C-alpha cells in the first residue's frame, strides 16, 4: 500500500457497485463457511485495487452479482490471488464462472524463491514487504449479516507483492 496510509474499505452487499472500476489488476480473496467446495457457501469476495482501496462484497444467497462476475471474467484485468486454487474453484462452484487471467503469488514465490522454506502469505509479506501479518482479529463467521473485527489489511498486500516478482 502506498504511503502506509489506511485503505478505504467499502462493504458492498450483494454485488460490487457498477461505478467501481479497476484498471490493470485486482487482488482477490474469498471467504467461505468452510473448506468443502460442494457444501460450504461462498460468503465474501474481497477485492483490492492498485491504490489499496478494499471492497468487501458480501455474497447473498440467490443473488446473481453481475458486476462482480464481469470483473472476474474481464480478460484485460489480472486477478491476483495467494494460493488461487481454492478461491478459483469456489468461485466456479458458486458463481458458475471461470476467473481469468490469474496471477498467484504463492506459485510466483515457489518459482522465484526456490530456497525459501515457506511460501505462506505471512512469510511473503514479511520477506518482501517487511510487514508482519496478524490474523488474530480475523472473524470466522463469514455468513453473518454484520462482519465484526475483520482484518482487511491482508488483501492490500497482494498488489505490491506482485510487483516484487
What does each model-found stretch correspond to?
Residues 37-41, 56-58:
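Short, glycine/acidic-enriched capping/hinge loops at junctions between secondary-structure elements
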Amino acid at each position: 500500500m502506498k504511503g502506509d496510509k489506511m485503505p478505504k474499505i467499502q462493504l458492498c452487499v450483494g454485488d460490487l457497485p457498477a461505478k467501481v472500476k479497476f484498471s490493470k489488476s485486482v487482488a482477490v480473496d474469498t471467504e467461505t463457511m468452510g473448506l468443502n467446495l460442494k457444501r460450504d457457501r461462498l460468503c465474501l469476495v474481497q477485492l483490492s485495487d492498485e491504490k489499496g482501496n478494499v471492497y468487501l462484497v458480501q455474497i447473498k444467497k440467490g443473488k446473481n452479482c453481475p458486476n462482480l462476475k464481469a470483473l472476474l471474467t474481464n480478460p484485460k484485468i489480472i486477478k491476483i490471488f495467494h494460493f488461487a486454487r481454492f478461491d478459483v474453484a469456489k468461485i466456479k462452484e458458486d458463481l458458475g464462472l471461470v476467473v481469468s487471467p490469474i496471477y498467484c503469488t504463492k506459485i510466483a514465490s515457489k518459482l522465484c524463491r526456490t530456497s525459501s522454506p515457506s511460501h505462506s502469505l505471512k512469510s511473503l509479506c514479511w520477506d518482501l514487504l517487511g510487514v508482519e501479518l496478524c490474523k488474530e482479529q480475523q472473524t470466522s463467521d463469514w455468513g453473518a449479516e454484520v462482519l465484526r473485527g475483520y482484518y482487511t489489511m491482508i488483501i492490500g498486500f497482494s498488489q505490491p507483492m506482485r510487483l516484487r516478482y
